[in-house]
Amino acid sequence: MKMCFPCLQCFCSTSDDKVVVSKNDKGGESGKKFRLFSYHELKVACDGFSSKNKVGEGGCGAVYKGRLTDGTMVAIKVLSVELESMRGEREFISEIAALSDAQHENLVNLHGCCVEEATRCLVYDYMENNSLAYQFLGREQNRNSFDWTKRKNVLLGVAKALAYLHEEINPHIVHRDIKASNVLLDHNFNPKVADFGLARLFQEGTSHISTRVAGTLGYLSPEYAVSERLTRKSDVYSFGVL
């Protein structure tokens, strides 16, 4: 089956045929480089996707730690894709559409992707301190070391990321799944909002969109769950739970 990726048309090639530069909403170059990786390159980077390099797993696939040929440490998400049902395909496209042109210190950086037959991979910066869920909701030892200064900095960082997504970038982005496991932490415990597989784009002037309810129970806003009307406030509610 031949698949079409409209979102990949938002990139233009450079002299290196493995590197593309994203375009902004006005057709100009945003300056953010987005790389198209080969499956072989990613397989080598994480030692054949060995279990020792697996750092996480969820309903959409597994995440592996890897090292690129230039020494860059990355996290490689290998999506579970079923082409007939499009399972995983929508999440893949949503992630690229949301992050390919977004640049903020509190958003996870998307280096690029891999599209080969049924293979769909996304390549991000590697986060040394895992996630907020791991650090704060995991072992008691981790939780005890997570002092109030770290907690405040994490909350401020996530708030800044949401302000950027909701107001500063165009089209605006509603994440739809803000939760502790989707807030990653770098080596200095700086927060990076991640996992945009459920994200929706809002054009300028759009106050809400009607869509199926998706997200995580406990973090979903009651208004969205009942009405299926998604707004920026849905993310704000999830942030309040966080």
From Swiss-Prot:
Supply the induction statement.
Neither up- or down-regulated in response to zinc ion contamination and in response or to mixed metal ion contamination (cadmium, copper, lead and zinc).
The family classification in the record reads: Belongs to the protein kinase superfamily. Ser/Thr protein kinase family.
- Identify the enzyme class: transferase
| Known EC number | 2.7.11.1
Q: Which Pfam families match?
A: Pkinase
- Its catalytic activity? L-seryl-[protein] + ATP = O-phospho-L-seryl-[protein] + ADP + H(+); L-threonyl-[protein] + ATP = O-phospho-L-threonyl-[protein] + ADP + H(+)
Locate the residues binding ATP: V55, G56, E57, G58, G59, C60, G61, A62, V63, K77
Q: Give a GO molecular function annotation for the protein.
A: protein serine/threonine kinase activity
Keyword list, A-Z: ATP-binding, Kinase, Nucleotide-binding, Serine/threonine-protein kinase, Transferase
| Taxonomic path | Eukaryota, Viridiplantae, Streptophyta, Embryophyta, Tracheophyta
Q: Where is the active site?
A: D177
Q: Which domain of life is it from?
A: Eukaryota
Q: Which InterPro entries would you find in this protein's record?
A: CR_Ser/Thr_kinase (IPR052059), Kinase-like_dom_sf (IPR011009), Prot_kinase_dom (IPR000719), Ser/Thr_kinase_AS (IPR008271)
Q: Outline the extent of the Protein kinase domain.
A: 49-242
Protein name stated in the entry: Putative serine/threonine-protein kinase
- The record lists the organism as Helianthus annuus
